[in-house]
Regions:
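Short amphipathic coiled-coil heptad-repeat segments
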Residues: 1-13, 179-194
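Extracellular/lumenal glycan-associated surfaces
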Residues: 4, 161-173, 177-178
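Non-catalytic DNA-recognition/assembly elements of restriction-modification systems
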Residues: 7-30
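A short glycine-rich beta-alpha junction/loop motif
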Residues: 31, 95-102, 134-159
């Protein structure tokens, strides 16, 4: 079995191979472009993955008709058309609608933030690339193929949470410093323009 080289103190169990479909339910969004509204339920597609924010909305009626399953807090959205394999964890309790260019993962037996980070790791990305239709333009992965991607995980939920929390804090720290960097970069450019 697999075992990471670096571990948090107190965790010694082997990691095991699992397929994504064994630890999460996988769905895709609507296949037709909806009729947009000025307000309503936020509608996400591949270009919104970084922020999970959009200026596109659909009506409550369209949402009720088209979405039996929709993203909820703790779920993961993954790009599957064009940019394949970028993920983000849903952190809002508001209703969200999404396009077919995104896959919705509802973690069942795994911590969301742990899974989000595992999905960005080389092993998962390699498995994703092997199942991506590279000849398609734009490239894409079929929804059914996503669940077949193998990766290594700890089955210890406490270890998953500890790893997930650690990477979540690290992501927030990186974002904080990126904002500071951009602020100083903007300040520098203003000084140069004088």
């Amino acid at each position: 079995m697999d075992r990471p080289k670096v571990r948090f103190k107190g965790f010694t169990d082997d990691w095991e191979k699992r397929k994504l479909g064994e630890v999460a339910e996988i769905y895709d969004g609507v296949h037709q472009t909806p009729e947009y509204q000025d307000k309503g339920i936020m509608f996400l597609s591949v270009e919104n993955i970084a922020t999970l924010k959009s200026q596109k909305y659909i009506s409550e009626e369209a949402f009720e008709h088209d979405y039996k399953v929709y993203p909820q807090k703790g779920d993961i959205l993954m790009t599957r058309i064009g940019d394949v394999g970028t993920t983000n964890v849903v952190e809002t309790s508001e209703k969200l609608a999404f396009y077919v260019s995104l896959a919705l993962l509802k973690p069942q037996t795994i911590d969301s933030y742990f899974l989000h980070n595992i999905m960005g790791a080389f092993e998962f990305q390699k498995g994703l690339k092997e199942r991506t239709l590279l000849t398609a333009i734009p490239q894409k992965i079929n929804k059914d193929e996503i669940g077949k991607i193998p990766f290594s995980i700890t089955l210890n939920i406490d270890e998953q949470k500890k790893i997930g929390d650690y990477f979540k804090k690290l992501d927030h720290l990186i974002t904080f410093h990126q904002r500071k960097y951009f602020k100083y970069e903007k300040y520098k450019n203003k000084l140069i323009d004088i």
